[in-house]
A protein has these predicted regions:
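Conserved "repeat-terminator" motif of extracellular CCP/Sushi domains
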Residues: 1-9, 70-94
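Short, compositionally biased
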Residues: 91-224, 304-312
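Short, surface-exposed beta-strand/turn "edge" patches of beta-sheet domains
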Residues: 62-83, 284-301
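An exposed tryptophan-centered "aromatic clamp" motif
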Residues: 192, 198-229, 233-303, 310-312
Length: 313
């Protein structure tokens, strides 16, 4: 028998160790007595989220990399080929771009459990320039990063539609004032408040893109996050830039949707919440959308785009 000791960060709780037959083992002087294989199960403390689903550092001899699975409300990892005393460290790994983000407000570098439980993919870590924690109405105490929804909004709402309907295209609401800030949440809130002051009930038949982004329900926005909103110009540029480092492949792991045009593998036109203080010949105000990898198109409010939302965690 070998000694297995476990050290864990404080976000992990309810740790149990079982042998190959499934028998739960008891601590013996701070260690578990194990054979050549065992399974470690644990949960994540709700008040410690957002956090990693678990990253393991092993000191000792085991035969394979440790990967986490999910079963019956626990996260699990199996150790095999144990042939010496082993110290297992369960670490709360910091988030990285391209990590999967899950509806329980956790993240992982690989897909764990049901892919439909994945809210989306992290496309930026840390607070973006111009984003302010005070804009989030007390929903967040810190900005850890940003997540792009796993499925296009068109799956829920149908075909691509213009930024807003004709009645509202000659309005300049004010989101044009910060074109280079990560302020999609503040922009979205400004547009929602504008509609409210006008006595408008938000729907697909007025401020279409804001309605679709904030009413998106195909993938869950976890409690403890901002909730879904329509990203700003620079936020959606960052999503497109992530194309070059593999966000397309990550999205396709957790979604069956066609996220790029089949002919050239470019992005769909992604809608943004950032206006432009210019008008076209019809008097319609401008809007930015994302036409290609990292390229913002100078469009107008009668242009059709896909307003797939983002969230802040």
């Amino acid at each position: 028998m070998w000694e297995l000791s476990i050290e864990q960060d404080d976000c992990y709780t309810d740790i149990t160790v079982s042998d190959e037959a499934g028998n739960v083992l008891s601590l013996d002087e701070g260690c578990y007595r194990v054979g050549t294989a065992c399974t470690v199960k644990y949960k994540i403390a709700v008040d410690k989220k957002p956090c990693s689903r678990g990253a393991f550092v092993v000191e000792g001899a085991v035969s394979e990399d440790l990967k986490v699975t999910e079963k019956e409300g626990y996260f699990c990892c199996s150790l095999t080929g144990i042939d010496s005393d082993t110290n297992l460290k369960l670490k709360n790994k910091a988030p990285n771009v391209l990590d999967f983000y899950f509806k329980d407000n956790t993240y992982s570098e690989y897909l764990i459990g049901n892919k439909n439980d994945c809210s989306g993919i992290i496309f930026h870590v840390g607070a973006g320039e111009g984003d302010n924690i005070s804009d989030y109405d007390g929903k967040l105490t810190e900005i850890h990063g940003y997540v792009f929804a796993a499925d296009p909004s068109g799956i829920q709402f149908g075909s691509i539609k213009e930024w807003c309907t004709e009645t509202y295209r000659k309005e300049l609401i004010g989101t044009h004032e910060h074109p280079d800030d990560w302020c999609g949440y503040a922009n979205t809130k400004m547009i929602l408040n504008h509609a409210k002051l006008k006595g408008i009930t938000l729907s697909d038949d007025n401020y279409t893109h804001i309605y679709r982004a904030t009413n998106y329900t195909i993938r869950t926005a976890p409690e403890g996050t901002s909730g879904w909103y329509l990203g700003s110009k620079v936020q959606m540029e960052a999503v497109a830039e992530a194309h070059d480092i593999g966000i397309k492949d990550r999205l396709q792991e957790c979604s069956d949707a066609e996220l790029w045009r089949r002919d050239s593998h470019h992005w769909r036109h992604l809608g943004t919440s950032t206006e432009r203080n210019v008008t076209n010949s019809k008097g319609y105000y401008g809007i930015y959308d994302i036409e290609d990898a990292s390229a913002a198109r100078e469009g107008y409010k009668d242009y059709g785009e896909d307003p797939t939302p983002v969230l802040t965690f």
